[in-house]
Amino acid sequence: MIKANDPNRKSWIEVASHSDFPIQNIPFGIFKTSEKTICIGSRIGNYAIDLNALHKLNYFEGITLNPDIFNKETLNDFLKLGKPVWRQVRDRIAEIFDTNNAMDESHKIVVLSKINEVEMLMPVKVGDYTDFYSSRQHAYNVGCMFRDPNNALLPNWLHIPVGYHGRASSIILSGTNIHRPKGQQLPP
């Protein structure tokens, strides 16, 4: 079993029973503190965890990590390290915040931020992506927009995966305001 996912593990950080972020679910993300510091972090309960601060305090000792791996504005470099390293870091976070381990109060002040006092940011810089027509209904709807409903699905759609290049700039955070065009207008 993955140590971080042990269902019997409990955290010394108070976690509501209905929380999406118990000690068994250790996500990675990017947040900005009230002091405007951008941090690679994680979350347990209602607290954001500054992984760079943990790293500087030697909590990741024994895990092969560059000194500045968590001193970035995106997760891209950390993600390149691969699943074995992610798992080691998650296991260590679970160990650090386990009820069997205590953290010095001066470390808590540096490492933890209340989640309602931070702003979540885009976790990765997306360079490019390919999207696929994986849903028949989606492909049909798009086909109706570009062709007529009688010829919405092209014959090849049922036989090969149809992919298309997507614009990385179209990937945004939930809740971001979007300026929607009002359509084309003829010049006056």
Predicted regions and their residues:
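Short, surface-exposed charged micro-motifs
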Residues: I40
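Active-site microenvironments in enzyme catalytic cores
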Residues: A4-T33, R43, I49-P188
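Glycine-rich N-terminal segment of FAD-binding domains in flavoprotein oxidoreductases
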Residues: K36-T37
